[in-house]
């Protein structure tokens, strides 16, 4: 059976033992917070990652409007924040590896190229800012194309039932950005993705608890 966490439900199905197959996917959401500032100096505040069940908040570094003067593209590292999905309590006798699929959520959307687009109707939101997600470990560094098949990074589940999936998120310009006629404006940046963790098993169904 497929397990349900908050935001997604899956059709139940029966699997027979004895061959490699996919285990119940775990699901959750990640909300990315950021800020584009008109200030001329940087003011720092301790940054933390908050967890509520399988729903997480990640705060990117504050950046400035001037940082968007030239095109950044999908290789941007502006304000980059690295984060990890930690898997634990996996049955390592049956769960062999894990991967995560990311889709837009909570009013966010995506571009055809897979960039994450914040909702446009939020009061005080920065304009012409998108977010770019990428793999950052387990031999994978490719762009995560939101709302497309993107669970390309595989984490091996170790003997103690743990595994890690490594990612990074950064600012980039929105698809309507133009340095002269449609520049980035100051304001908050908030976008959300839903993730589903898939686990490959060898004999029987098993689940993992994810968190960071």
Task: Indicate residue ranges for each PLM-predicted region.
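Gram-negative bacterial Sec-dependent N-terminal signal peptides
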Residues: 1-22
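Mature extracellular/passenger domains of Gram-negative fimbrial/pilin and adhesin proteins
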Residues: 2-3, 21-212
